[in-house]
Amino acid sequence: MACMEIDPGKEDAEHQHPFEQCGVVVEGKIEMFIGDVRRILEAMDTYFIPAGVLHGWKTFDVPARILDVSAK
């Protein structure tokens, strides 16, 4: 489990893991790319990333804080 604080205007390249991942946006706004689905998430929105699925994210003009859990 990790609490990630991400600065505005950042982007994570598309990647994948051999384990499931999920989390909740604590504050701010972030766009998540999970497989072919793109979602804009704000405070209290949750996400789930199945094992082996390509995913990534980008922030907007405000920072984002997310609580992220990896099921290794």
What role is predicted for each listed range?
Residues 1-14, 71:
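A short glycine-rich, His/Asp/Glu-containing loop-to-beta-strand
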Residues 51-72:
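Ligand-binding loop in jelly-roll beta-barrel domains
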Residues 5-7, 17-32:
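Short, conserved beta-strand element in jelly-roll/cupin
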Residues 12-17, 58-59:
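Short histidine-centered beta-strand/loop micro-motifs
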Residues 1, 20, 61:
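Short coil/loop residues immediately preceding or within conserved phosphate-binding loops
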Residues 36-51:
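Short acidic-glycine-tyrosine-enriched beta hairpin
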Residues 29-31, 38, 54, 63:
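Structural motif
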